[in-house]
């Protein structure tokens, strides 16, 4: 092990984040929201210049809501995209629909979430994340590259270099989060291997202008898959229907003879021809604005942690862009990890809590890799569908129904049958520990709210209408353990009013029961009815899930 740093560092910060794209920005934002100083370094000069991730799920919007960004993100989305766009497949835009995967992006969401799915280009989202993170105190440095990283067991010493001036500085941090992409140098440095389906396609995204208003009038589609003899790919249009991009994929083995190889020799003429073939109008005017080459890959890191260095986002898992899982899963990694780092750094939790990041998020990552691969096969390459293709898990389950299993969750004795389930439909979660706290409509101070609006920074106690004793127990437990703890009694005629009468059923509680919700919005423990000693039960549960 390398000896601890002897020369004072230029900069000291609790958490250094390597990689300042969407996941790195989200990590900095969530840490700042939890009151932890964070610094992120990004080698590029500015935030994203291409759309890249664009389909954002319900859970991601709930997290953005928790940091005050839901409205501005929804407003920005509505400027460019239809709010409830569907997802279908065509032979070409002129050739008609061959399959409909989602007719309305937000059909039925009201039951499960106060938010709405949406499309927003990554280059529009990242500046919003950056602005809010900086507003909350994050230190974000662009045009800055990492020279070296040393984890000595007591902290991490990182040498960074300003690319413009060449000046090098030493940063000392308690922990480092690597969100530096699928080719993560930090993952390689840790010797962490990856496994999965591997390379699926050498791909290109063609950014273009073409007037498709007549072809797409009244469709309000968010994503359009194209399957014909010339190409396989997908469109995403802005709602002007005059600009967008076409992602083109190579199917099967990209190196096979006759494969459409978009990794070399790809000219503007090729791009125009492919866009026209996808539109289905051979002589339509097409203006090519840019072409970005990339690889569609499905793989998962063997570990999410090495010492004081954690992997998040594409550094931990990479998926093909079918289902919109990549960016969403990365943002949710960031939130889970940030909440745990905050609890450890402020002395509330034991160091062992950080081990639960991998225990909770890696199974979700594995599920997500399989589901993105399955959607790739079913939507873009159905001829490769076989018995080895993973069965589809529905979108509501993927977005809101994943469950955590770790020492930070106290599983109930009668829950053993589903104890190892990684995912289930949110309607069936019923407040089980390890599941996301369900959305329930409330009336608070004459305002319509969601129970999710009561969560977000600290542990929260949610008790049924006859559970005032739990609120009193929470006050005493908070003092004994020295941690912030909010408590709410939810009922038809309480200050936090259950306007639809759903709270008890949604959380699986009697009128005197209680649920303990973690700062990341997941249920840590519950008592379905009144305990013999509520204060002892709650205090013991908190000690356990905090790994004290």
UniProtKB/Swiss-Prot annotation:
Its EC number is 1.14.13.210. GO terms for molecular function: FAD binding; oxidoreductase activity, acting on paired donors, with incorporation or reduction of molecular oxygen, NAD(P)H as one donor, and incorporation of one atom of oxygen. Signal peptide: none annotated. InterPro entries: FAD-bd (IPR002938), FAD/NAD-bd_sf (IPR036188), RIFMO-like (IPR050641). The keyword NADP applies. The keyword Flavoprotein applies. It catalyses: 4-methyl-5-nitrocatechol + NADPH + O2 = 2-hydroxy-5-methylquinone + nitrite + NADP(+) + H2O + H(+); 4-methyl-5-nitrocatechol + NADH + O2 = 2-hydroxy-5-methylquinone + nitrite + NAD(+) + H2O + H(+). Gene3D superfamilies: 3.40.30.120, D-Amino Acid Oxidase, subunit A, domain 2, FAD/NAD(P)-binding domain. One of its GO terms (biological process) is catabolic process. Its cofactor is FAD. Keywords: Aromatic hydrocarbons catabolism, FAD, Flavoprotein, Monooxygenase, NAD, NADP, Oxidoreductase. Binds 1 FAD per subunit. Activated by magnesium or manganese ions. Inhibited by concentrations of 4-methyl-5-nitrocatechol (MNC) above 2 mM. It is an enzyme of class 1 (oxidoreductase). It holds the Pfam family Rng_hyd_C. Involved in the degradation of 2,4-dinitrotoluene (2,4-DNT). Catalyzes the removal of the nitro group from 4-methyl-5-nitrocatechol (MNC) to yield 2-hydroxy-5-methylquinone. It can use both NADH and NADPH as electron donors, but prefers NADPH. Also able to use 4-nitrocatechol as substrate. Belongs to the PheA/TfdB FAD monooxygenase family. Monomer. This is 4-methyl-5-nitrocatechol 5-monooxygenase. It comes from Burkholderia sp. The gene is dntB.
